[in-house]
Regions:
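Short alpha-helical elements
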Residues: 1-205
Length: 205
């Protein structure tokens, strides 16, 4: 958290929220014997059109990709409840005037009401017969950012091959990835490197 706060983008007034699968095992025997049973559960990954056994990493980031809050939860845990918990349980995120950008999975009247009460404006896609919501033109580029952050964690930081077999082990290994991403963003932002702040190309050796 201290390193994230040292990044210039920490104070950005726009947040992006999303979750991504963290698989913890594939074989039936692993599921039966794993110390993660009860925390890890079966869930569905829409982007890969398949079920998985494991957790979901919930992230709130800035547009630069800087993680400002995270949570590891069971694969079926409600994304909206988790997002509210991440914000309400972290005093540093009590920032009236923030804007939170989310996908259609975060649609729920009570979710938006709680955000509004906290002074946070929700931007999400217009669904069905809803009255057109504002700022729809910004959704696509910012959705690409959060998806790019998830891809960085998976492709370059091996999130899906974390190798954790116990709760402390999984938490430590996921935190390693988030810390590595945060450190790269801090270095890129404070050294004025050209290009994306979340780029890890310089550190690929």
């Amino acid at each position: 958290a201290a390193l994230a706060r040292a990044c210039p983008s920490w104070n950005d007034d726009l947040w992006l929220v999303d979750s991504t699968p963290v698989e913890c095992g594939r074989s039936r025997e692993t599921v039966k014997r794993s110390d993660l049973a009860g925390w890890a559960t079966y869930g569905y990954c829409a982007s890969h059109s398949r079920f998985f056994w494991g957790l979901r990493l919930h992230l709130i980031t800035t547009p630069s990709g800087l993680p400002v809050a995270y949570a590891l939860a069971g694969a079926k845990t409600d994304e909206r409840d988790t997002a509210l918990d991440m914000i309400s349980l972290n005093p540093e995120l009590h920032r009236p005037g923030q804007t939170l950008m989310a996908d259609k999975g975060y649609r729920r009247a009570s979710f938006e009401t709680e955000l509004t009460d906290a002074g946070i404006t929700l931007i999400r896609p217009t669904l069905g017969k809803e009255k057109p919501r504002p700022h729809q033109q910004f959704l696509r580029p910012f959705r690409q950012i959060i998806e790019s952050v998830n891809q960085t964690l998976k492709a370059q930081l091996d999130l899906e091959r974390h190798g954790g077999r116990t709760k402390p082990g999984v938490c430590a290994r996921i935190l390693q990835r988030l810390l590595a991403l945060t450190a790269a963003i801090w270095h890129n932002e404070t050294s004025d490197r050209p290009g994306s702040a979340r780029s890890l190309t310089t550190y690929d050796h």
